[in-house]
Amino acid sequence: MINLKIVDNRHWRTTYMNSDYKVGDLIYDANIYDAMNTNLDDLYFYKRWLPKNKDARILELCCGTGRLTLPIAKEGYDITGVDYTPSMLAQAKMKASEAGLEISFIEADIRTLDLPE
């Protein structure tokens, strides 16, 4: 039997997850992330769930450096990537530009994300 302990995470949320302190930039280095995440074996799994209509809009949450966003955009889909870490988004934007892809990237906390229709 698994014994789980409930932890009060208010300190973490108020100290490290506010808009003034981007914890992701301290934890995640975009170059290291890319070096460690070169495998795209899971791309097939995600592509199976994509709509047949390539005009449909797709939202990728926690897109990081665009590991999945870019290959999906290359398939002709209109995809938007969202991430909270500025360095990850900068890397994703650079990679999209180098690939000649027009992809919208949004820096936001997905817990409070408010998108227009």
Where are these regions (language model features)?
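Conserved class I S-adenosyl-L-methionine
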Residues: 4-6, 10-64
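Anionic group-transfer/hydrolysis microenvironments
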Residues: 36, 62, 85
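Glycine/alanine-rich phosphate-binding loops at beta-alpha junctions
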Residues: 44, 65, 71
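Class I SAM-dependent methyltransferase SAM/SAH-binding core
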Residues: 69-112
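A short acidic, Gly/Pro-enriched loop at the edge of an enzyme's catalytic core
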Residues: 115-117
